[in-house]
Every structure is written in structure tokens, then in C-alpha cells.
């Protein structure tokens, strides 16, 4: 492939004078470029929605969601995966981020790692990849061998697959069932895909992980009710979520949370149904962990739930 022909590698005619601008004019021009990213992502929403549904189906069936990429793309996948356990209360290892070169590549460049298709395959094999899992390949260019090899292997195993790249009809996209390609255009700094391309990938990853977690019952209304209250800030947030969802006072929220071992969903259900912590936990289990379903039809639901 002629790398110079990739949109992400071409020069941006609007930023040819970056080195000759005042600092304010320079950052203004960079910001103007960034404002185009959300629009580019919006044009991929049908494909993003498809990826959300696929990821949710994978997780509900007991499979894992695995991001794999190199450089900035790989780091973004690791970042998104690492945020899922504290935000949504899922175990570590349910959403996984893999980067070419391993953990060391998060802070330093590992030369040549992205050019090895076999390395992408072996990294997935090390995770005992199975057909129950979903693999999302990440590469701004869409031609990174590490990610392409990984997606090809995942598809051969029968995994659900998706690709996120910022060039149209890329080799990576052709390996995936779902191709998400936000076309952000040439970078402000030629070839520096950590800029608009990285921002676009982050926005898409945000939607995929958040959307999938909503669809598997980790969110009630717009509250992350499976959050782990692991520090002072999050304990306070847990109290506020219980108060906001039920209309109760802080003291009642704190009492319910203590009885529920700081499981927010359980505490909310206890207050709205007068169930004990054990009964509320059982009722949630009967409804697959979906709080709205557990509350459905109960006479004590507040107006917001009707």
C-alpha cells in the first residue's frame, strides 16, 4: 500500500503556516480542526450502533470484548478497557485492551511491533480467544499489520469483529464484520494521528463500551448504578445516586448502602420496594441485574419511573 495516499498521511492545506503563527492563532487553528471530529463520527453512528449491539450480545452470552491495536490506537483501547471495571462494576478481564509490544508500549515506543501480523495473533492466543468473544481492531491508518492479523485470526475462529479506522475502505475494515470509519481528513500536523484520528477513535470507543454496558443492565436512567464505591469520592457519588433515583434523604441512602454493602442498585431497589438487602439482591438476580425491570410495575416507583 502507498502510505502517502492515505488521507491520514496527506498534508492539510489549512494548517501550512502552523510554525509562523502566534501561540493563540496556532491553538485556535488546532481547535478549529478538532471541531470537525464530532461530525465525522456522527456519520458512522449506524455502524457504531451495530457494534454496541454486537458487544452487548457478546457480554450477555459470557464472552469478552477485546480491543487490539498499536501506538495511539492501542493505548486508547487499553484506556477504555481499564475504565470499565470501576465505572460499571464488571470484573477485570471482561473488557481487555491489547497493544502491540505489550504493557511497555503504553509509555515507550516498541519498534517494529506494529508491523508483525503474527504478534497480533499470538497476543490473542495468549488470551485464550474463543468464538464467544468479540475483537475490535484499532488503527487510524487501517493498514497496521498487527491489528489486521489479529482481526483475521478472530474472524477465522468465529468471533464477532469490528474495525475502527480513519481511512475509507481500509484493509483493516475489510477484515471486520462491522467497519467504523470516521473520516476526519488530514491531520493539522501531517501524519500525527494522535490528533483528530485519535480523538475520533476515543469518541467511538466511549460509545461502544458505554452503550454495551447500558444494554447489559449496568445503567439505570443515566446513573452508573453498578459503579464500585472504592474511594471517598465514589462513596459520595453512590449516596447521591441513591438520593437522585429515589428522592430519599442522605441518611436513608447511607443506611441502605451500608446494608447493601454499597451496591447502588440494591440500595435503590430496597428503598423503592421496602425489600431487605437480601430480597432486593434476589429480585435483581431474577431480572438479570436490570434495575428497571426489577422495579417494573411496583407501586412505589417515583414519577420518573412511570
Swiss-Prot record:
The keyword Lyase applies. Its EC number is 4.2.1.126. GO terms for molecular function: carbohydrate derivative binding; carbon-oxygen lyase activity; ether hydrolase activity. Pathway: Amino-sugar metabolism; 1,6-anhydro-N-acetylmuramate degradation; Amino-sugar metabolism; N-acetylmuramate degradation; Cell wall biogenesis; peptidoglycan recycling. GO terms for biological process: 1,6-anhydro-N-acetyl-beta-muramic acid catabolic process; amino sugar catabolic process; N-acetylmuramic acid catabolic process; peptidoglycan turnover. Residues 55-218 form the SIS domain. The active site is at 83 (proton donor), 114. Induction: Induced by MurNAc 6-phosphate that releases the repressor MurR from the DNA. Repressed by MurR in the absence of MurNAc 6-phosphate. It comes from the Bacteria. Keywords: Carbohydrate metabolism, Lyase. InterPro entries: Etherase_MurQ (IPR005488), Glucokinase_regulatory_CS (IPR005486), MURQ/GCKR (IPR040190), SIS_dom (IPR001347), SIS_dom_sf (IPR046348). A lyase-type mechanism (elimination/hydration) is suggested for the cleavage of the lactyl ether bond of MurNAc 6-phosphate, with the formation of an alpha,beta-unsaturated aldehyde intermediate with (E)-stereochemistry, followed by the syn addition of water to give product. Specifically catalyzes the cleavage of the D-lactyl ether substituent of MurNAc 6-phosphate, producing GlcNAc 6-phosphate and D-lactate. Together with AnmK, is also required for the utilization of anhydro-N-acetylmuramic acid (anhMurNAc) either imported from the medium or derived from its own cell wall murein, and thus plays a role in cell wall recycling. Belongs to the GCKR-like family. MurNAc-6-P etherase subfamily. This is N-acetylmuramic acid 6-phosphate etherase. It comes from Erwinia tasmaniensis (strain DSM 17950 / CFBP 7177 / CIP 109463 / NCPPB 4357 / Et1/99).
